[in-house]
Curated annotation (Swiss-Prot):
Gene name in the database record: MXR1
GO MF annotation list: L-methionine-(S)-S-oxide reductase activity; peptide-methionine (S)-S-oxide reductase activity
Catalysed reaction equations from the record: L-methionyl-[protein] + [thioredoxin]-disulfide + H2O = L-methionyl-(S)-S-oxide-[protein] + [thioredoxin]-dithiol; [thioredoxin]-disulfide + L-methionine + H2O = L-methionine (S)-S-oxide + [thioredoxin]-dithiol
Pfam families: PMSR
Keyword tags: Oxidoreductase, Phosphoprotein
Domain of life from the UniProt record: Eukaryota
Residues with PTM Phosphoserine: 58
Name of the protein described by the UniProt record: Peptide methionine sulfoxide reductase
GO process annotations (BP): cellular response to oxidative stress
Cited PANTHER family: MITOCHONDRIAL PEPTIDE METHIONINE SULFOXIDE REDUCTASE
Length: 184
């Protein structure tokens, strides 16, 4: 059975909020958020979200191999826990639009497939509305071609442990060439 929240993320619902982001390979996404925002976020975890579940899916059956096989429609994502008194949804989303190419559909650099789509998965109706507004404000900066999907979070599965902090554990590991901080 899926959840909407990582089973291992540090998160206090009394003071923290969540956003789940898809911007290509989750290794690079996690690395960028930790490199630039680690002191301002509570925690983050990589996983798989907003795919088509079957009745037989369980946390152990939704895997990197299945997601990359292309038959699940899950996106590789980063779930971020944050205190809105420390960093806002707008700041997290502005950063999102600066660290990948949101104009490509189902790809980032050489990575192709629905698992690499650009997406913002909201954990509340208020966040859904705010994300749509922020996307519209970013449209002119990207030539009015942003392909980022904005949806409510439907489901979330933690990625396997070896994917967590992958580029910290494997400094020479693959990093998508579209993951860099743009001046905009």
């Amino acid at each position: 059975m899926s959840s909407l929240i990582s089973k291992t993320i540090k998160y206090d619902p009394a003071k923290d909020k969540l956003i789940t982001l898809a911007c290509g390979c989750f290794w690079g996404t996690e690395h960028m958020y930790r490199k630039y925002l680690n002191d301002r976020i509570v925690d983050c975890k990589v996983g798989y979200a907003n795919g088509e579940e079957s009745k037989k899916d369980s946390p152990s059956s939704v895997s990197y191999k299945r997601v990359c096989g292309g038959d699940t429609d899950f996106a590789e994502v980063l779930q971020v826990s944050y205190n809105p008194k420390v960093i806002t949804l707008r700041e997290l989303t502005d950063f999102f639009f600066r660290i990948h190419d949101p104009t490509t559909s189902n790809s980032q650099g050489p990575d192709k497939g629905t698992q690499y789509r650009s997406g913002l998965f909201a954990h509340s109706d208020a966040d859904l509305k705010e994300l749509a507004k922020i996307k519209e404000e970013w449209q002119p900066k990207w030539g009015n071609k942003i392909a980022t999907v904005i949806e409510p979070i439907k489901n979330f599965y933690d990625a396997e442990e070896y994917h967590q902090l992958y580029l910290d554990k494997n400094p020479q590991g693959y990093a998508c060439p579209t993951h860099y901080l743009r001046e905009m």
